[in-house]
Design a protein with these regions (language model features):
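Conserved P-loop NTPase catalytic core
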Residues: 1-85, 164-167, 172-174, 178-184
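Hydrophobic anchor residue at the start of the ABC signature
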Residues: 95
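A short, proline-enriched helix->beta-strand linker immediately N-terminal to the Walker B motif
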Residues: 98-106, 110
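Helical segment within the ABC ATPase nucleotide-binding domain
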Residues: 120-133
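H-loop/switch region of ABC-family ATPase nucleotide-binding domains
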Residues: 141-142
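A short, surface-exposed alpha-helical micro-motif characterized by mixed small hydrophobic
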Residues: 147-149
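Conserved short hydrophobic beta-strand within the ABC ATPase nucleotide-binding domain
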Residues: 153-156
């Protein structure tokens, strides 16, 4: 791996996609259209920009492809203002944008927070599909059922340290809870975060 904690944001983003915990504060610009949100980190690409001017037709075409592919439902299609969309469709738009960037590392923080069962199932399928393509998916979640069902390996943090590394097939929610509360630790001790 490469140490990136002191790298510029643009350099970090070259190799990772990020699905943020708070879709309103960090995932979308709520007063932008859906199509504008779909190219937030890509608008400088020659596909979407020429001589400092945005290629609106290319952006709209790209947004329409993602809307269709990820079943993002919005009243006015790509020109829908993000604020007017349901939480599930806002989250699907973020998932579409981030997964389409095709980066080797995906960091998903609370990706299903506040969503309905249908949207949760859809997002889970997308994350598993990315893992199956060989990408690294770092899932950060407080939903223990989600962690248990999606993870190949679980690292438990307590007080800024990794206190447990568990196989979801060999553990249960009760044991996970003991690690999370600090009542149980792996013998080797934890690595500081």
């Amino acid at each position: 791996g490469e140490e990136i904690s002191h790298s510029a944001i643009r350099k970090r983003l070259k190799h990772l996609s990020h699905i943020p915990e708070d879709r309103h504060k960090h995932g979308l610009v709520l007063d932008f259209t859906l199509e504008q949100n779909m190219v937030l980190q890509r608008f400088r690409e020659t596909r979407f920009e020429k001589a400092g001017f945005l290629k609106k037709d290319a952006i709209r075409e790209y947004a329409n492809v993602l809307i269709e592919q990820y079943d993002v439902r919005s009243g006015q299609g790509p020109v829908t203002i993000a604020r007017s969309m349901s939480g599930g469709n806002q989250q699907k738009a973020i998932i579409a944008r981030e997964l389409d960037r095709d980066k080797p590392l995906i960091i998903a923080v609370q990706p299903t927070r506040g969503l309905d069962v249908g949207a949760i199932e859809y997002i889970h399928k997308q994350l598993v599909a990315e893992r199956d393509k060989g990408k690294a998916v770092l899932l950060v979640s407080l939903e223990l059922d989600e962690v248990m069902s999606l993870s190949d390996r679980i690292l438990v943090l307590y007080d800024g340290q990794i206190v447990g590394q568990l196989d979801p097939k060999q553990t249960n929610i009760q044991e996970l809870g003991l690690y999370m509360s600090g009542a149980k630790r792996d013998e080797e001790g934890g690595d500081a975060i």
